[in-house]
Amino acid sequence: MTLAVAVAPLEKTPLETYVPPAKPSLIGLSRAELAERLGAIGVAPAQRKMRAQQLWHWMYVRGARDFAEMTNVSKEMRATLAEHCTVDRPEVVAEQISADGTRKWLLRLPSGDDVQKAHEVECVYIPETDRGTLCVSSQVGCTLNCSFCHTGTQRLVRNLTAGEIVGQVMVARDRLGDWIDRETPNGNRLVTNVVMMGMGEPLYNFEAVRDALLIVTDNEGIGISRRRVTLSTSGVVPNIARTGDEIGVMLAISLHAVRDELRDELVPLNRKYPLKELLQACRDYPGASNARRITFEYVMLKGVNDSLDDARRLVQLLKGIPAKINLIPFNPWPGSKYECSDWDQIEKFSEYVFNAGYSSPVRTPRGRDILAACGQLKSETEKLSVRERDALRAMAMTD
């Protein structure tokens, strides 16, 4: 059965302009940009490369939050830096910890604009026995209007800067005590994986996401392996190849349907980049192999996309693509038109896909009680009513 869901037309929404603070943060700058910034505040050309490398180490290896911590930088240089720049990251407005250990942070983004217009995003840390995954946002809000996703009900406000994206990783390390110091010379390794699966469509903010992930994966900095970084897209086809060529991280596709007519409803971007184009881009993805499989995310919606015929079509669609399929039980939110598939049906679907030769794990919902599960993120810029929050928590507790 296909639900007829009204979807808004895909239109370009006017974005608010990012206003940098009076003293901009150095977080998010490349080494070359750091050297250029140092030149702008009077550092001699012969010293810029060395000073930039010092700053890089203190920011991304040691997690320094103030220039005063940078003990191998001269006092005069530290004073000059403090006069013109900061190493600020987003401000933690609220932290929630789920019964399952998942943590969600509401982050206010530094801005030179009126504080009343400050924007907020959410990022989520999911601890597991063998890894710790940080779910990072790329935009304030989202423009895609995916009908099953809570974030899609919030208008797109603006793109995040590279610094605001890297800053989310740094905030997580701050809060978890995950930086290198004398007590933990190798770090605690609590944040081992990063997924660009938070608020927004990463490939509609490609340059900032690229620049941020190159910092996150830099071996002389934050140092998370590219194989442990996954970028999820709803299918912005022109930037998929660029992701492989320019960033080189793992790719995930928010698929959710095997027929164009249904995907047009669930993921309206499909009307611009239909399944045939999307899957060809996946076949052509640089570096894809059995060792670097593309993940296809598939939310399980009762009576909508969960039949065995859907499973058969899914297997046929992915033929020739090194892939695995993540089956995601639908996470409820107030006002949603959908229900989660019955567990028995999810297992049948998974078994069929597995027997066809594809890994098909069912993602365990995490953080539902703090609105941190897949598809539930929505910044406080557009607050839920008390009634909506109570309804959502009730769903989480009874699920």
UniProtKB/Swiss-Prot annotation:
S-adenosyl-L-methionine binds at G200, E201, S232, S254, L255, H256, N331. It comes from the Bacteria. [4Fe-4S] cluster binds at C142, C146, C149. SUPFAM superfamilies: Radical SAM enzymes (SSF102114). Disulfide bonds join C135-C374. InterPro entries: Aldolase_TIM, Elp3/MiaA/NifB-like_rSAM, Methyltransferase_A, RlmN_N, RNA_MTrfase_RlmN, rRNA_lsu_MTrfase_RlmN/Cfr, rSAM. It is found in: Cytoplasm. Binds 1 [4Fe-4S] cluster. The cluster is coordinated with 3 cysteines and an exchangeable S-adenosyl-L-methionine. GO terms for molecular function: 4 iron, 4 sulfur cluster binding; metal ion binding; rRNA (adenine(2503)-C2-)-methyltransferase activity; rRNA binding; tRNA (adenine(37)-C2)-methyltransferase activity; tRNA binding. Its EC number is 2.1.1.192. It catalyses: adenosine(2503) in 23S rRNA + 2 reduced [2Fe-2S]-[ferredoxin] + 2 S-adenosyl-L-methionine = 2-methyladenosine(2503) in 23S rRNA + 5'-deoxyadenosine + L-methionine + 2 oxidized [2Fe-2S]-[ferredoxin] + S-adenosyl-L-homocysteine; adenosine(37) in tRNA + 2 reduced [2Fe-2S]-[ferredoxin] + 2 S-adenosyl-L-methionine = 2-methyladenosine(37) in tRNA + 5'-deoxyadenosine + L-methionine + 2 oxidized [2Fe-2S]-[ferredoxin] + S-adenosyl-L-homocysteine. It is an enzyme of class 2 (transferase). Transmembrane segments: none annotated. Gene3D superfamilies: 1.10.150.530, Aldolase class I. Keywords: 4Fe-4S, Cytoplasm, Disulfide bond, Iron, Iron-sulfur, Metal-binding, Methyltransferase, rRNA processing, S-adenosyl-L-methionine, Transferase, tRNA processing. One of its GO terms (cellular component) is cytoplasm. Belongs to the radical SAM superfamily. RlmN family. Reaction proceeds by a ping-pong mechanism involving intermediate methylation of a conserved cysteine residue. PANTHER family: 23S RRNA METHYLTRANSFERASE, RADICAL SAM CORE DOMAIN-CONTAINING PROTEIN. HAMAP family: RNA_methyltr_RlmN. This is Dual-specificity RNA methyltransferase RlmN. It comes from Rhodopseudomonas palustris (strain HaA2). The lineage of its organism: Bacteria, Pseudomonadati, Pseudomonadota, Alphaproteobacteria, Hyphomicrobiales.
